[in-house]
Every structure is written in structure tokens, then in C-alpha cells.
Amino acid sequence: MNPIVINRLQRKLGYTFNHQELLQQALTHRSASSKHNERLEFLGDSILSFVIANALYHRFPRVDEGDMSRMRATLVRGNTLAELAREFDLGECLRLGPGELKSGGFRRESILADTMEALIGGVFLDSNIQTVEQLILNWYKTRLDEISPGDKQKDPKTRLQEYLQGRHLPLPSYLVVQVRGEAHDQEFTIHCQVSGLSEPVVGTGSSRRKAEQAAAEQVLKKLELE
């Protein structure tokens, strides 16, 4: 792996690994090696959820559990993590197998999001909880400053359903049109058909649920509700 690219990534992250092998593992997809990043991803997912929950708890002392849960879900969901990954140009640093490289895996939202979680797990093992917590808060500063409780934090499928019901329109239909990849690393493509839109809207994700949420989010944007 190009050391110039790796050093540039660490500068963008705001953290230099003491044990570079942890960084290498965090950037390695299971298609590239048996020493891949899925265990780090598991760890990072839990750490991220805790750090964001703790930040929201202290930022919003009068907000109830439901609104805090929805805000946390917005901040830790796959497309938010993928946005962060793109801000760090993470795609150019990924270690992917030939099949994933050929299919453009370095652009795939689910792979970018999973790698961000693996990096969080790697930083924790390389340092301590205080260091990784401060790093996450630095990454999320703008998003934490901008987020607020309310209906906008409901997931896209719920918001779309409520919008249509409020106008006495039929509920959206979701159809799986493609499933790519091996069982452990699939990508679902969903078509969402909504009354008033001439063509179905496409969403993709690492599970059917995530793909449906992505499609609903695109519908909301077309309806100018996002």
C-alpha cells in the first residue's frame, strides 16, 4: 500500500496509528485477505453508537429517548458514514479483492461505511476510549452542531409513509430488482414506486431494509421533502 496515500489519510483522520498493522487491517475488505476488517468493524460500530449517544445525551438534556434514538440513527447510519469516508478520500486507500475492484467496490457506500467503523475499532485498540471518543467528536462536530430533534430524524420510510398517508395517497411499493455479491457481502437494489412519480426510484444497500431506506430517501428528495 502506497505510504504517501496512507500518510495523507492519517493526516485527514487526525490520527497516526502507533501500530500500522491495525490500520492495514482496518482498510482490508474480506475479498482481499483472510485478515480482514470485520471484527474491527463490529467493535467500531458499538464504540460509535456509544460516543454519539453520550454526546446527544449531554447536548439535549430535555429531549426524550425517542428523539435521541432517531438523531443517533441519523448520525450513525451507513450513508452518513459513507459521506465521512468520502471527505477523507477513503476509497483510494481500501484493500479490495479483484472482483470488488472490478465492480467499483471502492465507491460502494456499504464498504465505505463498514471501513469507517473498522477504523474506529482500530483507533480504539491502538490507543484508548478517550482518544477515539475525541476523534469521533471532531469528525462529527458540524453534524452534531446542525442536528436537532423532530420529525426530520424519523427514518426515510416512516417519513415517506406519513407524507403519503397525510395526502390520502397509496403507500409506496418496494421491489427487489437485483442482489449482487456473496451471501456475506451482498448489495441489494430496490425499486420504489410512488404515486405521482412516473418512474420507480432506485435505492441500494447492504441489506433489503437499507436499500429500501435509501430508495425512500431518494423519493423524499424528489418530492423536495428532504
Curated annotation (Swiss-Prot):
Encoding gene, per UniProt annotation: rnc
Pfam families per the UniProt record, alphabetical: dsrm, Ribonucleas_3_3
Annotated EC: 3.1.26.3
Cofactor annotation: Mg(2+)
GO CC annotations, alphabetized: cytoplasm
Subunit structure: Homodimer.
Highest taxon above the source species: Bacteria
Function: Digests double-stranded RNA. Involved in the processing of primary rRNA transcript to yield the immediate precursors to the large and small rRNAs (23S and 16S). Processes some mRNAs, and tRNAs when they are encoded in the rRNA operon. Processes pre-crRNA and tracrRNA of type II CRISPR loci if present in the organism.
Active site residues according to the UniProt entry: D45, E117
Domain DRBM: 155-225
Record localization: Cytoplasm
GO molecular function: double-stranded RNA binding; metal ion binding; ribonuclease III activity; rRNA binding
Protein name: Ribonuclease 3
Family per similarity comment: Belongs to the ribonuclease III family.
Residues annotated for Mg(2+) binding in this entry: E41, D114, E117
